[in-house]
Structures are given as structure tokens and as C-alpha cells.
Amino acid sequence: MSQNKTLVLAEKPSVGKDIAHVLKCKNGQNGYLENDRYIVTWALGHLVSLADPEAYGEKYQNWNMESLPMLPEHMKLTVLKGSGKQYKIVSSLLGRSEVKDIVIATDAGREGELVARWILDKAHCHKPIRRLWISSVTDKAISEGFKNLKPGTEFNNLYRAAQCRAEGDWLVGLNITRALTVKYNAQLSAGRVQSATLNMIVEREEAIKNFKPKPYYNILAKTPQFTLTWQGQHGKNINSKETAEKILQKMKGKSAVIKDISKKPKKSTSPGLYDLTELQRDANRLFGMSPKETLNIMQRLYESHKILTYPRTDSKYLTQDIVPTLSERLKTISIGPYKAAVSEILKLGIHTNKSFVDDRKVSDHHAIIPTEQRVILANLSTDERKIYDLVIKRFLSV
């Protein structure tokens, strides 16, 4: 009698192999690894997606206004071109009699959930689901994650949100793209995000075209030690040249007296930990990197080097359960240019506060921070080092 097994579905081969290593699945096959307890397989990103309009009938074969809007009663799924081989492997494994349950180990986020659920739906697999939810792919994180697997039902709403996003993109994008193309007899495209972004660009362009600059004037008094700027009740800018000249005439030949000098200490707070958007913004401003370049670099630092946590986060905060790991994370980055700062922090003790630790402000994933994985800076490319440096300096600053 065959032993019951758990099938683990990862999003990419590299992560699947990392998980297989931790679970000691050494029996390598084409597209999966297994042992007497687990089968670890993987997608290649999306293996399954929403079917094109042509799948809903002949009337959608040709682009014309008569067939619009396209509003399928039930959205169909299809295996993506080039993914058929791996889908067949995964589908076959899901159907094996000894596989009694599934662990979804795709990226811990909305799209990762969709990758796995669409595969399960297409394969008509209704076996019990558990979820591996981790923010880094180090051996330690994977091992801890398997000790704390969550019921798949907890993520049903996340799947529904991803499904709504995908179906919304299909309905808006394909209908409007066909309508525009047919109406204007030109290859035009539209989309839920694309069209909204284009509108923002158009509005900005119109504002620039219609902007009418207004001159203003300042009055400066230069001394050997410093420069004084005249300031009235409404600020230092004077809209009228005539008014500026009148003020200047009144001050000519007069002496200024410094009546008081006050010094006040100011405390500047850290800008906070990085989420993906702010990291992309800073990488563009400082290094000229596009958002896609930054994300690709972050994926390598997360998946290949395993030295930063999950990149696709929209939170700048940590949860309380991360706090006990901060000391170990600091010790891991106590190298090279960061050693002195880490030493000072550890000497004074780690103090957390609501400015960066707040469970209520973390939904799927906490802010981007270093993992407990040992770092070898020499193994990083120039661009990887730049992004890593930004994240570590932010981490140290809080």
C-alpha cells in the first residue's frame, strides 16, 4: 500500500528546489522532486491564464462592434503557450492517488495565490489545501514556515481578489481595445491601469501647456558673514517690481541690528523602512534605474542570494513577531561598511516603537529588511550592491 504524500507547489523551479532541499526530497524527476513524504513541483510563473475571446465562440473570431461588449457568463481558463509540458507534469502529480493534500508554496501574495489556484482549478483538483506563507526563502524561513502551515481557506478572499483583478483586466482591456481599434481603424490598446496612467500623463501635459509663469522679486542684503532675505507678512516673494523698489528705497542707507540669536535642537526621524514603491523611487532618483530593473534586482536578492525579504510589499512596517529576530539580522549584516553602526546599535540595545513596528499596518508582507542569511558582499553585482546598500542603511536608521 502506497504511503500518503503531500504535494508542494512552488512558483518557480529555483524556489521549488530550495524547498525540496529543506524537505530532503532528493529523488529528482523531470519537473519535480520527491521523497517518501513529499512531492515538490513548480510552476513557471503563470502556467494557466484566462482564455482569449476566440475561445467563447466563432462570433469573437473577427473584431467588430456587433460582438461587443464581450461578457462571458463564466470565464474560461487555458494553459499558456510554452507551459504545456510543465502543466501536464503538475496536473498528473495532483491526480496521483497517494497525494492526499496540497501545500501552496507560490509567492506569498495576491498573484502567487492566483498562480496556484488557477492550476488547481484547471486540473479539477479539490484536495485539501494548506498554505506556506513566508517572507524569505532561506532554509530557516522555509523550515519554520512548514511548522506553521496555514489552512488554505484563510486565503480564499485573497484568491477572489486576484481573480477579480484578472477578470476586470480582461473585461476592460479586451473590450475597449477592440472598440478603439475598430472605430479608429488603427492598432490601439487600452487597459484598467494603462488607460488611467495615460490620463494622468495627459492631464499633466495639459497643465504644463497652460501654465503661465508670473514673475516675482526678492530683496537680499549681503554681509561678509551671511545673507539676509527680506520677508513680509505674506512671505519673502514680492509680486510687484514697483513694490519691491519702494521697499528697497526705504531700506537704503539704513543699518540692521541683530537683536537676538536663538538655537534650537531639532530631532530628525528616520524616513522609515522601505516598501517596494519607495525603493523603486529612490533607485530611480539616485541610480537612474527603472522600476522593473529595481524589481528584478530585488527578486535576485530575495530568491538567489536570499539576503533580503519578499520584495513585492506595500508596507513600511514590521510585525511584533519579527522583533525577536532583529538582533540576529543585525549580526548577519555586521560586515564591511555596516559593522560600526551595527556594533553601536547592539551596544545601546534594540528599541522598537510604533514608527516601524505596527501589526495593524501590515497586510500581506512586512517592510523590506535583511534576512538572517550570511552575506558575502563580493558575490553581489554593482547594481545588486547599490540596492542592498539602500535597504540596509534604511534598516539601520530606524
Residue ranges and their predicted role:
Residues 75-79, 106, 126-130, 151-158, ...:
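Short, polar/flexible loop-turn hinges at active-site or ligand-entry regions and domain interfaces
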Residues 75, 85-91, 97, 117, ...:
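C-terminal or mid-to-C-terminal helical accessory/interaction module adjacent to the motor/catalytic core
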Residues 135-142, 276-277, 297-308, 312:
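Short, conserved phosphate-binding/catalytic loop or strand-edge motifs used
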Residues 39, 47-81, 92, 188-303, ...:
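Long, highly charged, low-complexity internal segments
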Residues 5, 101, 302-331, 353-375:
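Catalytic phosphate-handling regions of large nucleic-acid enzymes and associated NTPases
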